[in-house]
């Protein structure tokens, strides 16, 4: 049960939350001016049929949507987790579009005080989608407010202090909470267990990424050769968000070079090399870490704190941002003694193999 300041009188309405982004699924299809204001939104698919990849996820959610609409109920609460950039926010907007309702978008760090989340909940319309990004960062008080809201569609509030305190239970309309996180393990068990659908988003394969790049190129009115499309897909780390970002950088170079026809693989290579993205998708930070390990420490093992100090980076940044893709490629290995460059990592940077290398 949460305590709300007695300054917020019930008769004067619910306290106002911090501004949240509201996406009206029906209006979004017709309002091209609003779409062009946000480039990322302009490249997002809006229906499940347009959403490329994540086939198992689409199948599960498609069945859940049809069942909920057939019963005339709100969709069950959904938790989406996985690495950043794979389409969790996009999927929340797609769900709202399929259900024909509004999607209210906010993030956990914006919900600092009880009144922030109370204001959001009491202003929800029936069957609306409430999307909370980085939901693992919710405060304990915010989580406790969500428990009865998710389970019983009820908001339990204690208004006032001391002898004047009184308890109020506010009925909420049926709604769908969609939570997104890159750290599902950081969610408390009571919160995680209240989601009816818990789904992981996986990295995308080459074929799906090529389809995503080709679709985005069409929306940006670019002509890409199949080879150029495949090259961008190879360098985007299996992540649509990065693929779209690289495509825009290619568009910039094509614009400056005044390329009027089809963009070929040579121009793609020129553009991505300019931004120091190599053939495997490694950027300058990735290569700097590997080169430091090889040049200064013979390939490792080296502790995380030592690496961070030498690179001038925060250890958390290295562990959460730089290392995951190197581990995924098999270029880096975490051992009890520290980080080690593998034989594959040596080969990519052109270093000779060493008998002591990790396989």
UniProtKB/Swiss-Prot annotation:
The keyword RNA-binding does not apply. InterPro entries: AAA+_ATPase, AAA_lid_4, DNA_helicase_Holl-junc_RuvB, P-loop_NTPase, RuvB-like_N, RuvB_C, WH-like_DNA-bd_sf, WH_DNA-bd_sf. Residues 1-22 are annotated as: Disordered. It comes from the Bacteria. Keywords: ATP-binding, Cytoplasm, DNA damage, DNA recombination, DNA repair, DNA-binding, Hydrolase, Nucleotide-binding. ATP binds at residues 43-44, 85, 88-90, 194, 204, 241. The RuvA-RuvB-RuvC complex processes Holliday junction (HJ) DNA during genetic recombination and DNA repair, while the RuvA-RuvB complex plays an important role in the rescue of blocked DNA replication forks via replication fork reversal (RFR). RuvA specifically binds to HJ cruciform DNA, conferring on it an open structure. The RuvB hexamer acts as an ATP-dependent pump, pulling dsDNA into and through the RuvAB complex. RuvB forms 2 homohexamers on either side of HJ DNA bound by 1 or 2 RuvA tetramers; 4 subunits per hexamer contact DNA at a time. This is Holliday junction branch migration complex subunit RuvB. The lineage of its organism: Bacteria, Bacillati, Cyanobacteriota, Cyanophyceae, Synechococcales.
């Amino acid at each position: 049960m949460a305590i709300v300041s007695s300054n917020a009188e019930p008769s004067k309405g619910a306290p106002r939350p911090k501004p949240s982004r509201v996406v009206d699924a029906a209006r979004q299809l017709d309002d091209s001016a609003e779409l062009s204001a946000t480039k990322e939104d302009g490249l997002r698919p809006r229906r499940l049929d347009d959403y490329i990849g994540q086939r198992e996820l689409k199948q599960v959610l498609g069945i859940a949507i049809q069942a909920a609409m057939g019963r005339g109920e709100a969709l069950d609460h959904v938790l989406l987790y996985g690495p950043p950039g794979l389409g969790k926010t996009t999927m929340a907007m797609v769900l709202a579009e399929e259900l024909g309702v509004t999607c209210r978008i906010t993030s956990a760090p914006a919900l600092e005080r009880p009144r922030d989340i109370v204001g959001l909940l009491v202003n929800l319309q029936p069957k609306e989608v409430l999307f909370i990004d980085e939901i693992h960062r919710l405060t304990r008080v915010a989580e406790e407010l969500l428990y009865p809201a998710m389970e019983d569609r009820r908001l339990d509030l204690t208004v006032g202090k001391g002898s004047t305190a009184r308890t109020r239970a506010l009925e909420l309309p049926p709604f769908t909470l969609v939570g997104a996180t890159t750290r599902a393990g950081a969610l408390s068990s009571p919160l995680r267990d209240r989601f009816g659908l818990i789904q992981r988003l996986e990295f995308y394969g080459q074929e799906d990424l090529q389809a995503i790049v080709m679709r985005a190129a069409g929306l940006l009115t670019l002509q890409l050769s199949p080879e150029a499309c495949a090259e961008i897909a190879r360098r985007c780390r299996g992540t649509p968000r990065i693929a779209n970002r690289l495509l825009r950088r290619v568009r910039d170079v094509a614009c400056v070079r005044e390329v009027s026809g089809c963009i070929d693989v040579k121009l793609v290579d020129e553009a991505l090399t300019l931004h120091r993205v190599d053939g495997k998708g490694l950027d300058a930070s990735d290569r700097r870490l590997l080169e430091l390990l090889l040049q200064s420490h013979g390939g490792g093992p080296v502790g995380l704190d030592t690496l961070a100090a030498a690179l001038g980076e925060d250890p958390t940044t290295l562990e959460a941002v730089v290392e995951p893709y190197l581990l995924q490629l098999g270029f880096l290995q975490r051992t009890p003694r520290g980080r080690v460059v593998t034989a594959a990592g040596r080969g990519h940077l052109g270093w000779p193999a060493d008998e002591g290398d990790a396989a």
